[in-house]
């Protein structure tokens, strides 16, 4: 069992809402001169879930799940920057308004540049959400440390997710981290 400082990290309540899908508002042109327009960042993406293939979708930088923001008009300012920093992979996210009120999901991570926090919910929950709904994230994980491995730095990781990762201590002060998929270096 990995020893951590999980009992001493700060936990915030963070509020966000789904952000509508974004577009450049223009068509792009491929290397053969063909115009195209593809779905991109943001939105409530109904048909992509955790575990689906990352490649092969007719999209560009599509975010699976629900792309959330605290402020769609000022994504790089407070309170959205706090949402970005304090929400961590594995944090519990609860819908607190609308038809999906009470539904629980989990933070997948962030999409830098778009300043979105991406939350995974089952499809049936996503189908009930609207862009005015409110979601509360229990932000915890920043400051998490491994007591016996101070050279390993943890960022954006909920301690409960760390515990579920089945990481084992191996000989020679090493950790064995299970891997489920090998992603090729070139797409």
For the regions a language model picked out, list residue spans one by one.
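Conserved mixed alpha/beta catalytic, RNA-binding, or beta-rich assembly cores of soluble enzyme
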Residues: 5-187
């Amino acid at each position: 069992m990995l020893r951590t400082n999980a009992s001493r990290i700060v936990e915030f309540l963070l509020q966000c809402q789904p952000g509508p899908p974004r577009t450049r508002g223009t068509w792009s042109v491929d290397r053969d001169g063909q115009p195209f327009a593809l779905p991109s960042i943001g939105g409530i993406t109904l048909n992509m879930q955790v575990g689906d293939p990352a490649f092969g979708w007719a999209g560009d930088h599509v975010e699976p799940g629900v792309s959330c923001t605290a402020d769609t008009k000022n994504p790089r300012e407070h309170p959205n920057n706090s949402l970005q920093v304090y929400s961590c992979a594995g944090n519990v996210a609860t819908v607190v308004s609308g038809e999906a009120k009470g539904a629980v999901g989990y933070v997948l991570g962030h999409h830098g540049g778009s300043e979105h926090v991406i939350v995974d919910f089952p499809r049936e929950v996503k189908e009930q959400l609207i862009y005015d709904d409110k979601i509360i994230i229990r932000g915890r994980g920043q400051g998490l440390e491994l007591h016996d491995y101070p050279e390993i730095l943890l960022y954006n990781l909920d301690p409960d997710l760390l515990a579920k990762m089945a990481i084992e201590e191996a000989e020679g002060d090493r950790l064995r981290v299970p891997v489920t998929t090998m992603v090729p270096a070139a797409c």
